Curated annotation (Swiss-Prot):
This is Protoheme IX farnesyltransferase, mitochondrial. Residues 45-61, 89-100 have a biased composition (Polar residues). Its main location: mitochondrion. It is a multi-pass membrane protein. It comes from Emericella nidulans (strain FGSC A4 / ATCC 38163 / CBS 112.46 / NRRL 194 / M139). Residues 73-88 have a biased composition (Low complexity). It catalyses: heme b + (2E,6E)-farnesyl diphosphate + H2O = Fe(II)-heme o + diphosphate. The keyword RNA-binding does not apply. Belongs to the UbiA prenyltransferase family. Residues 1-42 form a transit peptide.
Amino acid sequence: MILRSSLGRLGVARESPLCLQCLNRSRPSFPAVNKLASISRLQSTVAGQSPSSSVNKTYFSSHKGDSHLTPQPSLFTSLSPSNSPSQLNRGHSTPSTSPELSELPHRRRKRLKEAAAQNNGAEPVIPPDASAQLSNFSSTLPKTSLRRKLAAFFALTKPRLSFLVLLSTTSAYGIYPVSSILALDPTIAPLPTLSTSTLTFLYLTTGTFLSACSANTLNMIFEPKYDAQMSRTRNRPLVRGLVTRRAAVFFAIATAAVGLGLLYFGTNPTVTGLSAANIALYAFVYTPLKRMHVINTWIGAIVGGIPPMMGWVAAAGQGATTGHDTWRDMLFGENSLGGWLLGGILFAWQFPHFNALSHTIREEYKGAGYKMLCWTNPARNARVALRYSVLMFPLSIGLWWAGIVGHGFLVSSTVANGWLTKEAYGFWKHQGANGTARGLFWASIWQLPILLVGALVTKKGLWDGVWGGIFGQPIEDDDDDYVYYEEVSPGKTINQSPTSPSSPVV
């Protein structure tokens, strides 16, 4: 009975299309599967085929009646294509990743290096100047905002150029030797007619900055049509209409009047005359000459060389006595050599700086109609930059020879000028290609501050007291630099011979 019952139940099982064992085998997930099976499952998934669906489909389509008693190939045939060696080899030989991801690191570096070499001739993009950046900032503010108007007017001044003028002026003022001023005795000779306090320095800095603002504003007033044709200047305030032409003219006149007035009352008339000449030279000579002849670069270099003369004359005026404070005494006196040397350094510096800058945008200068060496004669443009870079050496040595700076300046100036000359030589050799124009431009940006700060640090007599305090060396006084007088009562005269040992030294 039990056997019959079992056989009966077996027959019933045979009539069933599925058994428990086959049902477990047909499940889509496998608890234990080898690595090859997992790879094949991944490949079939990428190809858009689901392993579970293929197993169920092939199994149920091939399972009929009591065929479960014999080995069914349907379950294994569904896995066999993905487990075949040929399919696995194809999966490893043709990965689904992109060529960039499968590229070896050294080949990628080589490819990027070759691409950079092909684009080496392309000129770097020059960023907008400070005026354009301020104009962009001003345009984002509400039209009735006070900050919008202030930013637009400040953009007229070319802030970076104005600060460069201020730096060269104050550096010359600080480099001027003050031993003659400190040695003045009010009981012997009257003090200078001009102020010797720090108020003079404040008048000088404020007046110089306002004068530079006026000159730069006038330059923009005359060139909005041409500024619109260049990428560096097309966002300036007058081009974009952030400031009216009438307001710009009023601003230029006001800054010139206030600046020159401060220089006249706070320094001396010679400084005021130099500043007025610089405004006229930059706005009314250099600006229109840019569209006429390449000599405009030399005129612009003269404009750059005047501010150091202003600082030197302002300092010299503090030690000038009444009757010896004329413009001839200031500009051509015995102590004026330092001012001319500093002015010469700024004059020479303009050429490597501007020639390198103009080379990178020479096509824009040409399109706007500006007569510049960078496109009219590129070879001469490079030669001029190298020539004036070499001129920096004798001008710097001249400051030491004149007794204005110490021996340390010879070292610092040689390093700075050597770097500039090296970049200028590469600029001349490659005619501005291979990144030499950009290298010379940045060398000029750093060379000038290094030179001026080096002159300030190594100023003659600045470290004498420190040197003597550290090494215990007394400061040697030169008796010839001082004048000794006898106290003479009123009405009494001295009738001693100049050669007499007891006569005062004059």
